[in-house]
């Protein structure tokens, strides 16, 4: 009888250990939290801090003789803004300039050639690289800074088909 009880206890103990071992390997992972603290009256939302704006597949016919694609809207969203000290914000875009296409435009890299990305304000006015946008009023809470971009063809050379990328960085200046 003692032997049966001992076997029962050992059997139960082994099943608990075996079950725990199986349960421990049913999935695991890591959650990494990243960010930065900035000295500014607004926070930039994570989904608009680094973004991709798809310009689409643009025909060479649309870019002929300095033609352009349709504009694609994008925005930089600010949250938790306070206007105690600063009332406006300007945005400055920088990147590799394509002066041969249009002064202040963003050069493209890749197989495609003879075109450039033009960044505009919400009203369609070009924001030249390295030049601050017009000041936009801030309000307490959340704010969207609205922009657009399009692909501009060269007026002197035919656009070369192929994939391209163009990367601009932005900096905000509060007044």
Curated annotation (Swiss-Prot):
Superkingdom classification of source: Bacteria
Cellular location(s): Fimbrium
BP terms from Gene Ontology: cell adhesion involved in single-species biofilm formation
UniProt KW Signal keyword: yes
Cysteine disulfide links: 42-81
Keywords: Disulfide bond, Fimbrium, Signal
Main location: other
InterPro entries: Adhesion_dom_fimbrial, Adhesion_dom_fimbrial_sf, Adhesion_dom_sf, Bact_Fimbrial_Adh_Pro
Keyword Disulfide bond annotated: yes
Signal peptide: 1-23
Any one cellular-component term (Gene Ontology): pilus
Similarity comment text for this entry: Belongs to the fimbrial protein family.
Function recorded in the entry: Major structural component of mannose-resistant/proteus-like fimbriae of P.mirabilis.
Protein name: Major MR/P fimbria protein
Lineage, uppermost ranks: Bacteria, Pseudomonadati, Pseudomonadota, Gammaproteobacteria, Enterobacterales
